[in-house]
């Protein structure tokens, strides 16, 4: 027997009739639908099924209170992603000079009509009268000295009475130390008065 090859169109017609299809697009339609998932069907998926794939463990061990809160967050956040395109999110940090100028011009109280920005200063500043610090400080120093010297002399006299009972040499040594300390204190006071009043130095003998 001679084998005769049938044309390709006849073979396709016969295969479509056997499968019950009348158009070639009906054969490829299921394949295209399988390759391109429907977004609406993905959105309509049950959130419990999605979380069962994301969260490890069996679906029966899930805490349904957490599932409900997560579902609320997904419902609240998902529409926002579709409203803002990705281009607006990429514009962060490009050039903010225009935004800063707009913010400056909004504050009309600190800008003239020509656009020059000014610093707002309070109209009435509290003005204190000029006081000479040297006179005030020197007067305070004198009053302090007049208040401190009498009790110091009293303590020195009592100390001399106590030292006189111990011996002459010890009294002499203590008096010498006291005089040196007093001379040092007087020199420090003279330096302070000279700095404050700008007078000639006082020579202490």
From Swiss-Prot:
Belongs to the coronavirus I protein family. The gene encoding this protein is included within the N gene (alternative ORF). Isolate N1 belongs to genotype A. InterPro entries: Corona_nucI, N2-like_embe-CoV. This is Protein I. It comes from the Viruses. It holds the Pfam family Corona_I. The keyword Signal does not apply. It comes from Human coronavirus HKU1 (isolate N1) (HCoV-HKU1). Keywords: Virion. It is found in: Virion. Signal peptide: none annotated. One of its GO terms (cellular component) is virion component. Structural protein that is not essential for the viral replication either in tissue culture or in its natural host. The lineage of its organism: Viruses, Riboviria, Orthornavirae, Pisuviricota, Pisoniviricetes.
């Amino acid at each position: 027997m001679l084998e005769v090859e049938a044309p390709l169109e006849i073979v396709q017609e016969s295969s479509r009739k056997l499968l019950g299809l009348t158009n070639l697009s009906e054969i490829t339609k299921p394949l295209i639908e399988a390759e391109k998932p429907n977004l609406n069907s993905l959105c309509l998926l049950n959130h419990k099924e999605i979380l069962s794939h994301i969260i490890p463990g069996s679906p029966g061990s899930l805490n349904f209170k957490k599932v409900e809160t997560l579902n609320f967050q997904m419902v609240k956040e998902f529409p926002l992603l579709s409203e803002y395109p990705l281009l607006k999110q990429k514009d962060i940090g490009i050039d903010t000079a225009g935004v800063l100028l707009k913010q400056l011009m909004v504050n009309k109280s600190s800008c003239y009509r020509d656009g020059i920005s000014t610093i707002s200063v309070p109209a009435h500043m509290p003005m204190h009268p000029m006081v000479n610090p040297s006179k005030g400080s020197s007067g305070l120093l004198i009053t302090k000295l007049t208040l401190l010297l009498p009790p110091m002399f009293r303590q020195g006299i009592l100390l001399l009475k106590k030292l006189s009972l111990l011996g002459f040499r010890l009294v002499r040594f203590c008096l010498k130390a006291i005089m040196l300390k007093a001379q040092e204190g007087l020199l420090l006071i003279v330096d302070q008065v000279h700095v404050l009043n700008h007078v000639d130095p006082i020579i202490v003998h």
